[in-house]
Curated annotation (Swiss-Prot):
InterPro entries: Ribosomal_uL14, Ribosomal_uL14_bac-type, Ribosomal_uL14_CS, Ribosomal_uL14_sf. The gene is rplN. Coiled coil: none annotated. GO terms for molecular function: large ribosomal subunit rRNA binding; structural constituent of ribosome. It comes from Borreliella burgdorferi (strain ZS7) (Borrelia burgdorferi). This is Large ribosomal subunit protein uL14. The keyword rRNA-binding applies.
Length: 122
């Protein structure tokens, strides 16, 4: 579960390293976001000469959460960190690579491009 002020790692090669959630999209009173939800982030740390800079505001999709997610078959999946992938205006990933595993729930949320870029889908 991601809410406002939550720090996330950026799991793509846009050059950002750490981001902070500043808004959960999808309703004015919406408080929490889960895997596959779109949030607004601000970049807190970035590597030099990258396409995203510190202080930039972007939309992102959540690909990993520390809070477990229950699946239809009764199993739970949990990750070591909270991570997101930066999106462009068309809601497609801005980077060309996705680092680390991503959850299968992204397939249900119609983020097939993120799933295809990921090295491992859990």
């Amino acid at each position: 579960m991601i809410q406002m002020q939550t720090y996330l790692t950026i799991a793509d090669n846009t050059g950002g390293k750490v981001a902070q959630c500043i808004k959960v999209l999808g309703g004015s009173k919406r408080r929490y976001a889960k895997i596959g939800d779109i949030i607004t982030i601000v970049v807190k740390q970035a590597i030099p000469n990258s396409s995203v800079k510190k202080g930039d505001v972007h939309k992102a999709v959540i690909v990993r959460t520390s809070k477990e997610v229950r699946r239809k078959n009764g199993t739970y999946v949990r990750f070591d960190d909270n991570a997101c992938v930066i999106l462009d205006a068309n809601l497609s990933p801005r980077g060309k690579r996705v680092f680390g595993p991503v959850a299968r729930e992204l397939r249900d949320a119609n983020f097939m491009k993120v799933v295809s870029l990921a090295s491992e889908v859990i």
